[in-house]
C-alpha cells in the first residue's frame, strides 16, 4: 500500500474517533459524577438533624464567602446576613415556627436577608430575591461540600414570619429576612432526592404533551 493510502486510513480513523467522542459527550456529561462540583450539586439534600458538633467561625466565614460569590444583578449585591449562634435565639426560632423546628438543635443558622434599596429601582427591585436566593444555594452547596448539612427555611414572602424575624433580630425596616438556613454536622446519612424529570424540558419553544 502507498504511504498516501495509509495516511488516508489514519485520517479517516481519526475523524471517526473524534465524531464518536463528540456525539457521546453530552451523554457522558449528564451523568458525570466524577466531577466534584457536579457531584456536590447532585448529592446535596436538606439536612434537618445535627450532631452536637460545633461549627467554627472560620467555617461560617467560608460559607458566607461562598454566598457572596453568587451571581447578582448588576453586581449590586443586595444580600445581607445575620449569623445566629445564640442558643436561646435558635431555640426561639425552633419554637416559633413549626417548619423550622430543627433550628432549636442547630449549632448555627444564617438568616439570609435582602436590602431591596441596594438593587435596581423600579421594576428591577425584585431582583433582590433572585440575588439572595442564588447566595442561599451557594451557601447550601458550600456547606454540603464541607461535610456540613443545611436546610433552607423560607421566611419571605410570608409576612407573619418576616415580622417575627424582624422583631427577633432587631432588623431595620429596609432589611427583609428571606430565609433561615440552619447549619450543622449531619446526624446520620440522608439520601438525595432524584428530581430529574425530562417532561419539564422544552427545546426552542413550549411543546404541549400532544405535539
Ligand atoms: C423557598 C424554600 C422554602 C423552604 N422552606 C422550608 C421550611 O420552612 N422547612 C423545611 O424543613 N424545609 C424547607 N425547604 C426545603 C425543602 O423542603 C426542600 O428543599 C425540598 O423538600 C427538596 O428537598 P432537598 O432540599 O433535600 O432536595 C424550603 C426550600 C425552599 C427552596
Labelled PLM ranges:
Residues 2-211:
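Acidic, surface-exposed loops and disordered segments
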